[in-house]
A protein has these predicted regions:
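Central antiparallel beta-sheet cores of small beta-barrel/beta-sandwich binding domains
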Residues: 27-92, 123-197
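Short active-site neighborhood of thiol/selenol oxidoreductases, capturing the structured segment around
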Residues: 254-279, 284, 297-298
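C-terminal motif of bacterial Sec signal peptides marking the signal peptidase cleavage site
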Residues: 15-17
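Structural microenvironment flanking redox-active thiols in thiol-disulfide oxidoreductases
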Residues: 279-311
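Short, structured interface segments
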Residues: 95-122, 204-230
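N-terminal "domain-start" segment that seeds a small globular fold
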Residues: 221-257
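Positively charged n-region of N-terminal signal peptides that target proteins for export
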Residues: 1-5
Length: 311
């Protein structure tokens, strides 16, 4: 259950500052590093980082990139785009060390290292199944289904874990003996998957964020599906309509009443804690522009922040 949350109603969808990675050219300047967020003694999520003057460009595998502007002298500090996440770094003889931390959570801090060099994602020679139907073992006897989905981008292994409420966004990986590893870091969500594959069966482990962990097992099944989201969410039988008064981004109150709408309307429940809300926001913004006023889109943002200004 979320505590101390604030609801923000916004008519327009925000655009986000993640982008496709730009290929480096021979004329590129600055320094390249292998960045690592250390989840525990034996697990780290690594990624490429480029430092150009006071700007760090993080590369989430081969699928997206984002920038963090640094300030300070002895201790460099920066804020990640979109999400309530910051970092600090100090220079050492062979790179930088510091912390990644969330500003909307107490004591959510993980060691962050930048070591000179660069990661190379080798092409994956094996043909893994495109989809595995897995069972996640979440502890205390709790088991939940998911789909581990794999693909190749320019020959490099990419994937995600999809559940009935979303997925783990973009992960990039490589083969290891007997299976594969996937990693992803987008400024907020930190994932590592280690899997062993034998014929059509799979088993493995997932580390998420600072303390998240579960094991899984499953079988290859390209036709497997999850619970229909339209059956998961519906208006309660004792409610006749949807109505709210909420503050908009400009501070004015926005009143919505489903009984008065005159065009197709999308209500998007979102927040910076949601892995897929950024991707959904891009899609909804595209829809809104393409239909040129023929639809309405409302973003209802729930945040952990203690104040409206911070949210």
């Amino acid at each position: 259950n979320m505590k101390n949350f604030i609801i923000i109603g916004a008519i327009s969808m925000a655009l986000f500052s993640c982008s496709q990675p730009e290929p480096k050219t021979e004329a590129a300047t600055g320094q390249d590093f292998i960045g690592s967020i250390i989840q525990n003694d034996s697990t780290r999520v690594s990624f490429n980082v480029h430092l150009e003057e006071n700007t760090l460009t993080f590369y989430n595998g081969i699928q997206e990139s984002f920038e963090v502007v640094l300030s300070g002298e002895d201790t460099l500090r920066g804020t990640f785009p979109v999400f309530a996440s910051d970092l600090w770094l100090v220079a050492k003889e062979d790179g930088f060390e510091g912390e990644y931390y969330r500003t909307d959570a107490n004591n959510y801090r993980l060691p962050l290292e930048l070591a000179p060099g660069g990661m190379t994602y080798e092409q994956s020679p094996s043909e893994f199944s495109g989809q595995y139907a897995i069972t996640r073992y979440l502890g205390e006897g709790i088991e939940k289904p998911a789909l581990l989905q794999l693909d190749k981008k320019d020959g490099v292994l990419v994937g995600t874990i999809a559940t009935s409420t979303g997925d783990s966004r973009f992960m990039t990986g490589y083969e290891v003996e007997g299976g594969f590893e996937l990693m992803g870091f987008d400024g907020r969500f930190i994932y590592k998957v280690r899997a062993t594959v034998s014929d059509s069966t799979i088993e493995g482990h997932v580390w998420a964020g600072m303390t998240g962990y579960y094991s899984f097992s499953g079988i290859a099944d390209d036709n497997a599906t999850l619970e229909d989201p339209e059956e998961m969410s519906s208006l309660r039988e004792d409610y006749t309509h949807i109505e709210w008064h909420l503050p908009g981004l400009d501070g004015d109150t926005v009143h919505f009443d489903s009984r008065t709408i005159t065009k197709p309307t999308i209500l998007a429940i979102q927040g910076s804690w949601c892995p897929n809300c950024m991707d959904e926001g891009r899609v909804l913004d595209q829809y809104y522009r393409e239909f040129e006023g023929a639809i309405d889109v409302f973003g209802l943002s729930y945040e952990y922040s203690g104040t409206l200004e911070k949210a």
